[in-house]
């Protein structure tokens, strides 16, 4: 059996989600049709050098409408949104917009990397994706800054506002945050 004859390499009409393709195009991904699969995006990707993440495959699947294959793929979360792929794309495809939209769809469908959920939990608890620690406070003092930045760390009352927004948008439910335990479910 050749590579092309493998069952997993066959695109079936039933797997194509035209609504997903249209949603991507409506969100600025209409440039997707210009992609001719040159591979510049994948070759430019710093994450792709160290992981199985291949942005070119995601773009191809998005163009075809293979929503389920994209949103269930754990490598979707390996993109750092550095824009290296998009800046180098000879066809000016809005690659990062496509990745972000695909991640939103993945999250809605229950596919989200545990590390991303953990960052979301930190935002709920502290207002920051990366909470301040003792070492950072010492560094801030050493360069003449206050120990705490002028954010929710310095103004804890602002955290309540952040948490209201999180509840109003349903972000807490999206990541499975339990307000009683303060942990992810």
Curated annotation (Swiss-Prot):
Catalysed transformations (reactions): coenzyme B + coenzyme M + 2 reduced [2Fe-2S]-[ferredoxin] + 2 H(+) = coenzyme M-coenzyme B heterodisulfide + 2 H2 + 2 oxidized [2Fe-2S]-[ferredoxin]
GO-annotated cellular components: plasma membrane
Residues given in the record as [4Fe-4S] cluster 2 binding sites: 45, 79, 82, 85
Cofactor requirement: [4Fe-4S] cluster
Record keywords: 4Fe-4S, Iron, Iron-sulfur, Metal-binding, Methanogenesis, Oxidoreductase, Repeat
The UniProt record lists the keyword Transmembrane: no
Gene3D superfamilies the record matches: Alpha-helical ferredoxin (1.10.1060.10)
PROSITE patterns: 4FE4S_FER_1, 4FE4S_FER_2
Domain of life: Archaea
Residue ranges of domain 4Fe-4S ferredoxin-type in the record: 25-55, 68-99
Pathway note: Cofactor metabolism; coenzyme M-coenzyme B heterodisulfide reduction; coenzyme B and coenzyme M from coenzyme M-coenzyme B heterodisulfide: step 1/1
GO BP annotation list: methanogenesis
EC number: 1.8.98.5
Pfam families on file: Fer4_8
A molecular function (GO) term: CoB--CoM heterodisulfide reductase activity
Record text on subunit structure and interactions: The heterodisulfide reductase is composed of three subunits; HdrA, HdrB and HdrC. It forms a complex with the F420-non-reducing hydrogenase (Mvh), which provides the reducing equivalents to the heterodisulfide reductase.
Name assigned to this protein: H(2):CoB-CoM heterodisulfide,ferredoxin reductase subunit C
Organism: Methanothermobacter marburgensis (strain ATCC BAA-927 / DSM 2133 / JCM 14651 / NBRC 100331 / OCM 82 / Marburg) (Methanobacterium thermoautotrophicum)
Upper taxonomic lineage: Archaea, Methanobacteriati, Methanobacteriota, Methanomada group, Methanobacteria
Encoding gene per record: hdrC
